[in-house]
Regions:
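Active-site-adjacent loop/helix surface patches within enzyme catalytic domains
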Residues: 7-132, 136
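Acidic, His- and aromatic-enriched active-site or binding-groove loops in soluble protein domains
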Residues: 60, 154-173
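A charge-rich, low-complexity, intrinsically flexible signal that marks solvent-exposed coils, linkers
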Residues: 85-88, 149-155
Length: 173
């Protein structure tokens, strides 16, 4: 179905992996980016919607730029795991998680597609505006769980996102 907020096709494929208690909009402070880290997109969708996996994000951006809605935004998706940013711990409760289809470091890590990044920018802008997310609270999974996670990885276009008014970028030169 077409979204009212974006031109990209959005597919609903709900995951059972979220807290049943609704949260308040004002609790949402972070935007967390992930890669799926699975051999195929089909495998990623299967894992993110399987009750036994106990993992899901709010959104998945497919290779072709389509968005799959996995968990409604006002519910806590299980995407961050053991996590910390500054003094805040367990970021699932205060974040929106976006998975981007990519095999990741263990399965042939590749560049993210232009369609994925275009969709990510639109979705991120929408979420940033809706929840008033601060630039320094737009993070990668590796930022909040550095001892156990690598995603979204070194091929993730942080500088390009920054140029599109998403997140921060430190130019060291």
């Amino acid at each position: 179905k077409k979204s009212l907020i974006m031109k990209e096709k959005m597919i609903i494929n709900y995951s059972p992996n979220f807290d049943l208690k609704k949260r308040k909009r004002k609790q949402i402070k972070f935007l967390i980016f992930h890669y799926t880290g699975m051999r195929s997109e089909k495998d990623a969708i299967k894992r993110l919607t399987n009750m036994q996996s106990e993992v899901a994000s709010h959104y998945l951006i497919k290779n072709n730029g389509e968005i799959i809605i996995l968990v409604p935004e006002l519910y806590t998706a299980w995407h961050a795991g053991v996590s910390k940013w500054q003094k805040k711990r367990q970021l699932n409760k205060s974040s929106i998680g976006i998975e981007i289809s990519n095999p990741g470091h263990k399965n042939g890590y590749k560049n993210f597609s232009k369609k994925q990044i275009k969709t990510l920018i639109k979705l991120s802008r929408y979420l940033i505006k809706k929840y008033k997310i601060k630039k320094n609270f737009i993070l990668g999974h590796s930022d909040i769980a550095p001892d156990r996670k690598l995603d979204p990885g070194e091929k993730f276009p942080w500088e390009f996102l920054y140029k599109n008014k998403i997140g921060i970028w430190h130019n060291l030169s």
